Amino acid sequence: MESKAIARHIHQSPRKIRKTLNSVRGLKVGEALNQLHFSPEKAAKIIEKTLRSAVANLVNNNEKLDVNPEILDVKEAFVDGGPVMKRFRAASMGRASQLRRPTSHITIVVTDEK
């Protein structure tokens, strides 16, 4: 069985999130959660929350099946770019410079199959 969780409109660039997300792809869920919990990155906290949501989705949506969270694997983990918020900042000589505030969408798929 597979289950998916998506975190949308995360206020961090996809490039920064991808750095942390690549380290948990393909791991067992327990190992991935342990690695994310002790990571100092801001993205690690968001990825950990999304991973826990994917595990909860699998357990709660398949109540008839006996699913053990210990044997689950992270099958897919990827990040896509979300909408970019464009803001302006005052610059010298009466000008304005543009600020880009990128957002991201994180998708994590967990499975109990090999």
Stretches found by the model and what they are:
Residues 82-114:
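Strongly charged
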Residues 1-79, 104-114:
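Ribosome large-subunit tunnel/peptidyl-transferase-proximal elements
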